[in-house]
Amino acid sequence: MTWKIVTDSGCDLRSLTRQSKELRFERVPLTLQIGTEIFRDDDGLDIDNMMTTMYQSSKATTSSCPSPEAFLQAYRGADNVIVMTITGTLSGSHNSARLAKNELLEENPNVNIHLIDSLSAGGEMDLLVLELERLINLGLSFEEVVKQITAYQQKTRLIFVLAKVDNLVKNGRLSKLVGKVIGLLNIRMVGKASNKGTLELLQKARGQKKAVSALIEEIQKEGYVGGKVYIAHAQNPKICEQISEKIKSLYPDAVIQTGRTSGLCSFYAEDGGLLMGYEI
């Protein structure tokens, strides 16, 4: 039996830990438009160039979800397909993936396919994909993998830290005045993905050190006691080190992985920000 894990670019991972003929990973890119320029969030995207273009532009950046056909092409060629998308509250990607699922089943009624709305993005999606890989490599049945990943999703969370809010201002979600104050006072916005997949602000912290303390406080409130962590960061390895050191000082056995945000997640996190997934 062959497997595919299919995600959109709300997931930061470019590949699995160990790919094989039996298990393949497909990442279906969203696109980002800045003025007249279009950036496809695939492996060839120069994220630094995209971010520079974004900050130089006075216009709002918009994202477009993959077409159902793009998902359908990614689904083909496996007996078992598990699909995961960025939260449906931020993108139409989940709906495109659902339409493609229906088309695939019309083409091939014998294929096993399961679609998951991550209700999240970035680090939490990354954790979920890594767990999917682990479960599949255990040799479990399709039904058992679906059962276990559904249970696992109830035990993962997303927390984010924003160091810049240019996109929120350009998209009209924050006033220019508030945006300037945040920049001048070196304020970090700390928030989370709710259980409905919306992004909620939790705290405002002045400076990175206080933002790390706020993050630790919030994940402990959610029930964190040393589970796995995946930190997806936008050009900020320093905050990854600070968070890792703090978590390790409290929970020495915690397994912490870090990586750079995808183009889409860089757009949401902005320079210096992060989207961290963790287990409770």
Curated annotation (Swiss-Prot):
Domain DegV residues, every copy: 3-280
Keyword Transmembrane attached: no
Taxonomic superkingdom: Bacteria
Keywords: Lipid-binding
InterPro entries: DegV, DegV_C, DegV_domain_contain
Protein's UniProt name: DegV domain-containing protein SpyM3_1478
Single annotated GO MF: lipid binding
Species annotation: Streptococcus pyogenes serotype M3 (strain ATCC BAA-595 / MGAS315)
